[in-house]
Design a protein with these regions (language model features):
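Conserved PDZ fold ligand-binding element
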Residues: 21-39
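Terminal peptide-recognition signature
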Residues: 19, 27-30, 55, 99
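Short, Lys/Arg- and Gly-enriched loop/turn segments at beta-strand edges
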Residues: 36-44, 63-66
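Short, structured beta-strand/loop micro-motifs enriched in basic residues and often containing a Trp
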Residues: 6-15, 35-38
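Hard-cation-handling environments
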Residues: 240, 247-278
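PDZ/PDZ-like peptide-tail recognition elements
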Residues: 1-8, 20, 46, 54-59, ...
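Conserved Radical SAM active-site core
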Residues: 63-67, 71-217, 227-256
Length: 278
């Protein structure tokens, strides 16, 4: 468990639920279940599945209630919390040369500027994560709760190049976490955002070759061209791909698709639709 103290404020109670019967009210805090601090929604769902549980609730006046509950294994308590994840979203620690959010115009709604890099959102919403802020504790929970598939933004398997592209000196070492997930039997999907003159050409071939080592748990890898907008003042200089560039990229991908299909019976590496539209 992390050093952070987790107190989950009750937002609402379902009428006729176990929670209502026990006198739990909006504004109360859930402190623990069976003596275990609850980090997020995954801990909560795991512990409330038991037929016999003990809740520690702190009322709004500070009084703590220990509530012993007997219920059916699949019966919910009827508690809704203020945050769907029951925790803060984890933000990105990178400064990627290709970051699309950095290229957005001003004046849009605040949520569009939030850079998430949260493995839990990868499971819940299909978001891609870079692994740079994933701790050993996070990996253990992913394996324990089978939070799969995890969608990973690889960009490259060259550690030095990955550090450069993500502008994070830990980005290369973060690739070792893929081994942990693989050893834990976790299914994954991958993505490579291709930047002209950076991770294409021989580097793309290296990445595809390296990633085949994780088949069958790494189910697929998509290759997409970097998205560039006109709002790039002060950002890393990147050139857009041309039609001829797209032909070269597709040639590499199709070559590896044939090789991988012959060996594994799957295509594995896939080109984004954008390549065919250039």
């Amino acid at each position: 468990m992390t050093g952070k103290k987790h107190e989950h404020i009750v937002k609402s109670i379902m009428p006729g639920s176990i929670a209502e019967e026990l006198g739990i009210e909006p504004g109360d805090k859930l402190l623990s279940i069976d003596g275990q601090e609850i980090e997020d929604i995954f801990d909560y769902q795991f512990y409330v599945e038991d037929e016999e549980i003990v809740l520690l609730i702190e009322k709004q006046d500070g009084e703590q209630w220990e509530l012993e509950i007997e219920k059916d294994a699949d019966e919910q308590l009827g508690i809704e919390f203020g945050q769907g994840l029951m925790d803060e979203y984890r933000s990105c620690r990178n400064k990627c040369m290709f970051c699309f959010i950095d290229q957005m115009p001003e004046g849009m709604r605040d949520t569009l500027y939030f850079k998430d890099d949260d493995s839990r959102l990868s499971f819940l919403q299909g978001n891609y994560v870079t692994l740079t802020n994933m701790s050993d504790h996070d990996i253990e929970r992913i394996i324990r709760y089978r939070l799969e598939p995890i969608n990973i933004s690889f960009q490259t398997t060259n550690p030095q190049l990955r550090c450069k592209m993500l502008h994070n000196r830990f980005a290369g070492d973060a690739l070792k976490k893929v081994d942990r997930l693989f050893e834990g039997g976790i299914e994954m999907n991958g993505q490579i955002v291709l930047c002209k003159g950076e991770n294409d050409g021989a580097e793309l071939e290296r990445s595809i070759k390296d990633l085949t080592a994780y088949i069958p748990l790494l189910r697929s890898v998509s290759v997409v061209p970097v998205g560039l907008t006109k709002f790039r003042d002060g950002l890393y200089h990147l050139e857009p791909f041309t039609k001829e560039d797209a032909k070269e990229v597709l040639s590499v991908i199709h070559k590896w698709q044939d090789r991988i299909y012959e060996q594994y019976g799957i295509h594995f590496i896939h080109a984004g639709d954008e390549w065919y539209l250039l």
